[in-house]
Amino acid sequence: MKRTFQPSKIKRARTHGFLKRMSTKAGRRIIKRRRARGRKRLSA
């Protein structure tokens, strides 16, 4: 059985990237929460 995690930087950025987060209301809420928490990295 192959491993389920096949890393790809492009796929990661497109799915979990900043622009993707900002494109939806829920995503903006995530960014807001991470800012409030003081995360160094807000998104992938």
UniProtKB/Swiss-Prot annotation:
InterPro entries, A to Z: Ribosomal_bL34, Ribosomal_bL34_CS
Superkingdom of this protein's organism: Bacteria
NCBIfam families named in the record: rpmH_bact (TIGR01030)
Name of the encoding gene: rpmH
Organism annotation: Desulfatibacillum aliphaticivorans
Cellular component terms per the entry's GO annotation: ribonucleoprotein complex; ribosome
Similarity-based family: Belongs to the bacterial ribosomal protein bL34 family.
This protein's record includes keyword Heme: no
Alphabetized UniProt keyword annotations: Ribonucleoprotein, Ribosomal protein
A family per Pfam: Ribosomal_L34
GO molecular function: structural constituent of ribosome
Protein name: Large ribosomal subunit protein bL34
Annotated signal sequence range: none
One record GO biological process: translation
